[in-house]
Amino acid sequence: VCMANTKPLVDNEETLRYVLEEGKKTGIHVLSCAAVSKGFKGEELTDMEGLLAAGAAGFTDDGIPLMDGPFVLKAMEEAARLDTVISFHEEDKSFIRENGINHGAVSDQLGIYGSPSLAEDSLVARDCMIALETGARIDVQHISSGYSVELVRLAKKLGADVWAEVTPHHFTLTEEAVLEHGTLAKMNPPLRTELDRQMLIAGLKDGTIDLIATDHAPHSKEEKDKPLTEAPSGIIGLETALSLGIEQLVKPGHLSLLELMEKMSLNPARLYKLDCGRICEGAPADLVIFDENETWTADQFASKASNTPFLGRSMTGKVKYTICEGKVVYQD
């Protein structure tokens, strides 16, 4: 499922149809969310009903936080009416001086302030309560703060239809990675502390965190070679996600392999109400065959970019075949 933060933005039916038509040429299923607000400005709602009819999987202004509370309330009311999902990028920029780097011990070493967990926690709290008020289905994207996990856990307990996702890099790495990998470990929200990482894993284990999503964000070498405070945030993640899930979650015993598949496949399908993500008679023959024990080196990517702190790392768990609608579209 692609996000709407493309050029041009997916905030109208024409652009959405273009993305979906181009996706059909890839050999795999490419879906797309549409924007919540026109121009990602957080001021005027897009035609959510029309975009849904045109094929939008859901709605998000991913990368740009929605700061106006009454606007968010209006958006959730419309989403509830249409029975669709809104995904939220939760970072209040008023608390952030330099994005992509956690405010903490590492930012202190670097002589910058960075991005505190409070920037995430404050918006997660707001949106969980608005979801509870409206009955809307929402997804807290790429959760990174342990306190935000606690807030989502409470919202679920209160009865809110709140879902949460975590990236492989957030459950694998901490802010210390910035000291080793520089801009290749810079992303929004940032890598946080070891305590946060452990709280993310605990959230995966008890079901507070429903999904694993990559937040795949390619950038050129030239962009990432800029100084830390000037380089863009974001890393690629599609090709390393499975291996990191196996290494960090399955091998240590945090999740079973079936539970990992639930977080990576079945639950995303449930969130977007898609008829996929499961293996049973009559289900779509969309399958990935992998060897959970085979090792490989993350040094060559199908992506045009290689901006990842896992570059050159030995990984465990290798995809052997990808099958879409019964056709082999990738073979190792």
Located regions from the model:
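Metal-associated gating/positioning segment near the N- to mid-region
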Residues: 1-23
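Short, ordered loop/turn segments at secondary-structure junctions
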Residues: 3-7, 35-37, 64, 91-92, ...
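Short acidic, glycine/proline-enriched helix-loop-strand junctions
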Residues: 12-15, 28-29, 79-84, 161-163, ...
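Histidine/acidic residue-rich metal-binding segments in metalloenzymes
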Residues: 21, 43-212
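A glycine-rich helix N-cap at a beta->alpha junction
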Residues: 21-36
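His/Asp/Glu-enriched, well-ordered alpha-helical/loop segment
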Residues: 109-137, 184, 205-206, 210-212, ...
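C-terminal cap of metal-dependent C-N hydrolases
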Residues: 227-230, 284-331
